[in-house]
UniProtKB/Swiss-Prot annotation:
Subunit structure: Component of a red light-dependent nuclear complex made of PHL, PHYB and CO. Interacts directly with PHYB and CO; CO binding requires the presence of PHYB.
One annotated Gene Ontology cellular component of this protein: nuclear body
Stretch forming the signal peptide: none
Disordered as annotated region, ranges: 313-371, 462-558, 593-616, 852-875, 1160-1325
Regions of compositional bias (Low complexity) in chain numbering: 596-607, 1160-1224, 1240-1262
Expression sites (tissue/organ): Mostly expressed in cotyledons and leaves, both in mesophyll and vasculature cells. Also present in roots, hypocotyls and shoot apices.
Listed Basic and acidic residues bias regions: 518-529
Lineage per the UniProt record: Eukaryota, Viridiplantae, Streptophyta, Embryophyta, Tracheophyta
Name the UniProt record assigns to this protein: Protein PHYTOCHROME-DEPENDENT LATE-FLOWERING
Amino acid sequence: MGVSFKISKVGRKFRPKISTELATPDSPKAIVLSGKPKATDDSNIGDVSGFSKPSLPDISPDHEVSFILSLYPNGYSIGKTSEAMQQISFRDVPKVLHPYDRAAEGLLSAIEAGRLPGDILEDIPCKFVDGVVICEVHDYRKHTSSQVSPVINKLRLKMSLENVVKDIPSMSDNSWTYGDLMEVESRILKALQPELCLDPLPRLDRLSKNPLTAKLDLSLSTLRRKRLRQMAEVTVMSQNKIQGKKVCIDRLPESSERGNLPGHLIMQQTNNNQAIQNLGTNMLAGLRSQPLQDAPNSSLALVPPQQQRYMGIGSTRNTQDQGSNSVSVSGASPGGLDAMLPYGSDSMNPGTSFHRKRESQEGQMSSMPGLNKRTRVSHMGPDGVPQQQLGQRMDGLHGSDTNWKNTLLQHQDMLGRSIQYPNTSIQRFSPHQMEGVMNQEGGPMQFPASQQGGMKYTSKEEPFETGKIDGGTRNNIPGVGSDANDLDPRIQSRMPHNAFIRSNFPQTSWNVNPGQQIEKEPKKEEQFSRRISAQSPRLSAGGPPQSPLSSKSGEFSGGSMGTHYGAVAAAQKDKAVTSIPAIGATQSVGSSANEAMQQRQHQAQMAAKRRTNSLPKTQVISTVGSPVSVNTISVPVNARSPSVGPQTLGDHAILDRFSKIERVAARYQLNCKKHKVDEYSRRPRVYAKQPLTVCLSNLSNEEVFKDEDEALSKSIFGGSMNTYKTRVIHFGQMERVMQGSVPSFIPRNRTRLVMSEKAVDGTVAWYQGDVDEGDVFQAEDFLLALPNTHIADLLATQFKSLMAREGYMIEEHIMAKPNRGDTGPISSHPNSAGGYPRGYSANDMQQYGDAVAGQASGEASKHGNTGNTPNNSTQNILANARMVPPTNSQALQMSQGLLSGVSMPMQPQQLDPQQSALLSSHSQQKNQQSMFTQQQHPQMQRPSMILPTNPLSAINSMSQSSGMQPGGQMANKYSPLQLQMLQQQQQAAVQKKIMMGLGSGVGMGMGMGMGMGMGSMGNSIAGLGALGNQLNMAGRGMGGTGISSSMSVPGIGNMGQNPMNLNPASNLNAISQQLRSGALTPQQNALFTQIRMGMANRGGVMGAPQTGISGVSGTRQMHPSSAGLSMLDQNRANLQRAAAMGNMGPPKLMPGMMNLYMNQQQQQQQLQQQPQQQQLQHQQQLQQPMSQPSQQLAQSPQQQQQLQQHEQPQQAQQQQQATASPLQSVLSPPQVGSPSAGITQQQLQQSSPQQMSQRTPMSPQQVNQRTPMSPQISSGAMHPMSTSNLEGCPASPQLSSQTMGSVGSITNSPMELQGPKNNSAGNNS
């Protein structure tokens, strides 16, 4: 298809000109376009109008018209301009017209919208002007033969998307590239949619408006109705044998313009005789929407006119008046719904006509002389098939009523079975009374029935789907329920005169033999009863409407001339077939008529009982018949009619019968149709029990399940993924070895992959080989490292896959990384200072563990100074949120009422003198080496000027180096001598059946927490408990740490941590030897001199009393009090004074300063006593065998200094004290003391009177500041704290010096206390 475009050669701007057409007087007004009135020319006045203006203002007369569309009443045509100009008048209609079919609707709708039709574009002689097609529409539909000129409109048709879609395949080919396609698409889009809105905002105004605006109004709805009216009409043919004349009624020509018809049926009237009035209810039947399929051609041999008047043979009809609303009236007679209406011979009122223009009539029916003729009634069903052939002999008007009865019942039965639509009424009175009744959809008739002429009826309606009608019948039934007051006055005036005419029976019908009985047909009655609804009335003959016997003026009753039948206004809507009611006919004389009517009513009641309960009740009207045949009838009119009498209830026999049928059908499932979808499988499913049994047997009963596939980076311990973890994967190969005749599998090659997460930087140290996990922990800083745990998991996955391929058995587990204090063997705990940065003061590390309410004691101990610090826990300590300033840490802890406690030395274990000598000599060598190491590596220590709160920072590094390498690493290197001594120590403990808490393992097992064993002395930062103002005592519970004390000197506490530093005094002895030999610099000499002075001044204060108190742990919580300290002192005379000084000391000692609490005389005395103290220390080391390793690990340098100064005087006092306290032997049974709880009487009695006097310079104000939280001091027995007495006791036990037992009774840890042999009050060793 080729598309041509015409480009204008004129260069000036286009200005459309208004075209003026000559007006034609006979032409109608111009058609209104686009919903807006178009102004006509000035020459058009009134009804005279010429051609309309162009529909689009931009179309000028100069534009050439492409094609012309001519619209005619019966079709349309499309032609060229030359052809159309010749057809200037209505007479020149082309012979060939296109009908208004569906294709025409698509064409005309596209032209109305201003679009170029897409389906018939090829057939239209197109000529494009500026890219559009100009169409000229000539409308001849509103013109008559006298009118010449049509209404002309010009319209511009644009291309639409439909045209583009159809033309693109013909235009494009395979040679087009993608760019060509996009170019064409963009141009087409720009031409079709010049304004493309891409704004995302919603445009509700565009959504509500119709995007297609009509450019021209072609009245397509009128054309559609025209097309429907042009469909074939119903042709009803009737063969009437009257006088040998055959009457054939064919389709009628009618005008195509009748306007909008509310009804679907058109009634055309012809002049006929008055016999048409006597057709009863044929005028009032309410079949408004009967499809054409239900009105087939039927041929009925009709009965004589006298009988036709009562049989009501007729077809559907509609009456329309030009001056009023149309009334849809349809009639259905017993003889047949679709039978053709005959023309009667009754000449009554032959000249009457309707108040309207009458159409031409085709003929008059002659009178019917022959009444006694045998007739054949052929009834046609909805499908055009004859349903029943009934032959009855009509004996004439004077025949028996039985024949009439049978005939009427037969016709009624046929109608009930065949009709699919309810009838409004089949009245037993003439249309004189009912013509004026109000219709439901139309007003009252504007003409009396007496003026009706002969009428001819044809069906004019749109086709409908029969399935829609049959499935659910829409009963638009006109109501009959209006009173006689609604009747036309002219009809009421004629009623008395036409009383006998309405009956349509001669007077001789009253003389019918009353003895004749009505013949019944039970089979037909049964079939008929199934179609009767509950609202169908029981009818009988009665008196005339305005007779004296009529009950009310508004009631409808029959005449009194004999056999009659009436009609019922059934206003019922139901899916089922609604049939006309039973018709009761009576004889005219005597009680036989009443009996016959009663029998008919009884049968009708039994037949109607089926719908009695399911349908709504309808009001009824009861009337009284004539004097001859007085019967009671019930005629339901509609809801607006008053209820005169009660409705008669029917028998329940049939209802019971149906209920039995339903029960039987439900019992045997007769009407139950099952679908295959509903039939699901009922096969029993078999489940294998063996897999379930195996699964249940392999289930673990543990509550904590560990996923075998957990990775190091995703495993959770303690509710957090940030816990440092260790992953150990064991690999092993099993080798089969025959041991005799029994094969056995033994591991042949074993190796493991250990991955340990570092706490310092988050890297993962890993090692592969046959190595223990503990060795990896200690040397993890020297191993290979991975950047993070994710890389470590990837390495482990790869390694596992390789080992599995080699046939190794794999077993792995992920565990929380053990703390540094738990890694080594017993008594081999590394330095606690490794957990803290070296050189930091203890006050800087002070943990405020008890300040938070609800904190567990275990957590406090974990963060405390008991050696439970994780490996390389520098960042943990620095990030701890519970660190407090060093100056007020004690006050905050004391405000809580409980202090954490001070690590105290335990009862020393007796070792052989040879072992003691060896250890002592080895320790001296190590101390000397450490001193030289410190001198060689001065950069490893921090100067004391940086730490003003740490007076012994120089000793810190020296004590650490005694058991560590200079790099400060945490891997201890044991010599063979150390391992031998440790082994002997353990054997001795096992032989004596003593549970040695030499490490945190035993201490934690007893529920006492870390820091309570021998080795945990070093793990506790304040292991010495001296030279500081931090005094924490009495742990927070059985499960917590009893020893979480802190002080300002972490270095001093580390002196006793090394397993080889079994005698803490050896450190000072080595220092003293170095002082004598001049190995130290003068600055170091001065520093150590000041340290020894401070130790001597406070040796009794911080030595024995504090170590005695710190042993109280677990449930036996002790508050810091004067009694708690004084009762442990040897000087019982100075209890209160010693307690005041023992509970507190100077907050801090500045380097290079003397004790601030000493006067000048005391300081001078201390300076004089320094050589004597050194000599005593040296003599004690040479004379006395070395003490037990546990005591030397736990004792602080202050206590050793006090022991060296006053050893001989205190021994004598100790013997006196042991013999003078009889209660001690009672209150101190053989106990197993905690590693940090046991102390000896010798240690308690190391304070001299001079030291006690040194404690006294303290103001009462300071005493009051330190003692407000102390427990009450009263007389009473103290609970013996042993393993046999673990019950809870008051948090602050009342202590008294009168009832204090041995020091070992203060603890409840299962550790035996061993005192000197000369201690009579000591425990059994």
